[in-house]
């Protein structure tokens, strides 16, 4: 599944075998976000995690968003 671009945001939903697998993934993303100093919006559901990226201070998508999206995708491979 690819990232979906809507307005000034890209988002993607990841599915997991268990709720805790999703939580582990969110923790990995949190560490990555701190390293990159770029923080996504995260929605946690049952066996699903939705990540949304935008550069708030720019009011638009920037290279930071696409870079973090790639790094997040790399966590799942």
Residue ranges and their predicted role:
Residues 33-43, 70-77:
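A short N-terminal helical cap/helix-turn-helix that marks the beginning
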Residues 1-9:
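Short aromatic-glycine-(Arg/Gly/Cys) micro-motifs in beta-strand/loop hairpins
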Residues 51-77:
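C-terminal structural segments of small proteins and small subunits
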Residues 4-5, 42-44:
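Short beta-strand
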Residues 10-17:
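Short, well-ordered beta-strand elements within core beta-sheets of diverse protein domains
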Residues 27-28, 70:
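Solvent-exposed alpha-helix faces
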């Amino acid at each position: 599944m690819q990232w979906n671009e809507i307005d000034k945001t890209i988002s993607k939903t990841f599915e997991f075998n268990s709720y805790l697998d999703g939580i582990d993934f969110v923790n990995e993303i949190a560490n990555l976000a701190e390293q990159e100093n770029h923080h996504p919006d995260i929605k946690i559901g049952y066996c699903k995690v939705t990540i949304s990226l935008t550069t708030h201070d720019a009011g638009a998508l920037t290279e930071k968003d696409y870079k973090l999206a790639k790094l997040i995708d790399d966590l799942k491979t």
